[in-house]
Amino acid sequence: MSEILVLNCGSSSVKFALINPHTSQSLVTGLAENIATKNCKVVFKAEHKIEKYLENGSYKDVFEMLKDFLVENKHLEKIVAIGHRVVHGGQYFSKSVLINADSLEKIKACIALAPLHNPAHIEGIRFCQQIFPELPQVAVFDTAFHQTVPSYIAEYAIPYELTHKHNIRKYGAHGTSHKYVSEQAAKILTQQKANVIVAHLGNGCSITAVVDGKSIDTSMGLTPLDGLVMGTRSGCIDPSIFAYIISDNLGWSVTEITNMLNKQSGLLGICGHNDMREVSQLAAKGDSLAKLAIEIFSHRVAKFVASYMIYFNKLDALVFTGGIGENAANIRKNIISKLANLGFMIDHQKNSNSETFINSKNSHNIMVIATNEELMIAQETQNLI
C-alpha cells in the first residue's frame, strides 16, 4: 500500500498528513507550531493523539521528529513521495511538477509574489531533501488552477510593457482548494463539470468563479493580498492609500506598509482580533468594532459573488468552504442576506446544521463542502511519480 506524505510549511508551523491516494484515507495528520520558540509543540493524530514538545525546536528538529515517528510506526517504508503545498508558482507553473534544481530555482524566483509563504515552502523542501533524500518530491501550486483565467481578466490596466516585462498579472491563490471543492460539488450535483462560485473563507479568503470546471475569475491577484477582507490581510484597497502612507506626511517604508497590509489589517486591523470565532463572540456581546468587522467582511464577499454572476447562464451552486465557510453559520447567513435580490435565500435550520445544501426551496443552490487540500495534493503527487 503506497502512501504520500503531504506537507504545508509555514513560517513558524508545519502541517502534515499521510494519505493513501488510492483510497483517499488519511492515515496520520499532524501539526508542528511555534517553531523556534520555547512553546514549540508537535501533535500527531493517528489511532491516538500524541503531543510532543521541542523547546526552541528548529525546522530541522521538527522534520527529524517526523521521520522518527514514521519509522517507529512503520510508515516510512510505505511512503513513495512527498507532496508540498506551494502558494505561488508565478508564470512558471500551470500544473504540479517534480521538484528538481530548476523547479526549485523558479519557486525561489516567486518569493516576492508570496513573501509570507514561499520562503517557508522552500525551507521545507530543502529539509526534506536532507532527511528523506531517497523520496521524490512534488510541488502542487495554489496558483496553477487559475492559469485558465482569460487575459482580459488577468491583465491589469497599467502600462503593457511593464506588466509583460515583470510578469505582473492576476495569479490567484487557494487553487488546490477551489479545484477540489468545485469537483466535489460536481459529483454531488451528479454533473461531469459544474458552474459554481466557490467561497474559500478562512484566515485567508478568496472567491473563484468556476465555469465548466475551469477557473475563469478569482479574487486574489498578483499576490494573496488582493480581494476579500481576511484575518490579517486588507484585501483590495485604493492603491493610492499606499502612496499616501509612504509620503512625507507619515514616512512609512515600503516594508512597513507591506507588513501592515499583510499582518496587521483585515479583521485584526478593524477590531483587534483575526479569529472570526472571537470576532463573532464579541459582536454578540455588542462590540461595535466587531460588528463593523463582520459587516465589512460579509459585504465584500457578497459583492464578489454578485459580480461573478455575470459569468453564468445558469449557476449550479454557490459553495462555502474553509474554516469560516464550513463552520460559521452566522457569517453565511449574513452574506446570503445581502444576495436576496439575486435569488439566494437561506434555510435557517439547514444552515445552523451546516448541511450540504443550506438554501431554501426557491433559491439557487447554496452548498457547504469541506475542503481537502491534502487529498488533492496527494493525488496530484501520485499522478506525477
Swiss-Prot record:
The keyword Nucleotide-binding applies. ATP binds at K15, H200, L201, G202, N203, G204, D275, M276, R277, G323, I324, G325, E326, N327. GO terms for molecular function: acetate kinase activity; ATP binding; magnesium ion binding. One of its GO terms (biological process) is acetyl-CoA biosynthetic process. Gene3D superfamilies: 3.30.420.40. The active site is at D142. It is an enzyme of class 2 (transferase). Substrate binds at R85. Mg(2+) binds at N8, E373. Mg(2+). Can also accept Mn(2+). The record marks H174, R233 as: Transition state stabilizer. One of its GO terms (cellular component) is cytoplasm. It catalyses: acetate + ATP = acetyl phosphate + ADP. Belongs to the acetokinase family. Catalyzes the formation of acetyl phosphate from acetate and ATP. Can also catalyze the reverse reaction. HAMAP family: Acetate_kinase. Homodimer. This is Acetate kinase. It comes from Francisella tularensis subsp. holarctica (strain OSU18).
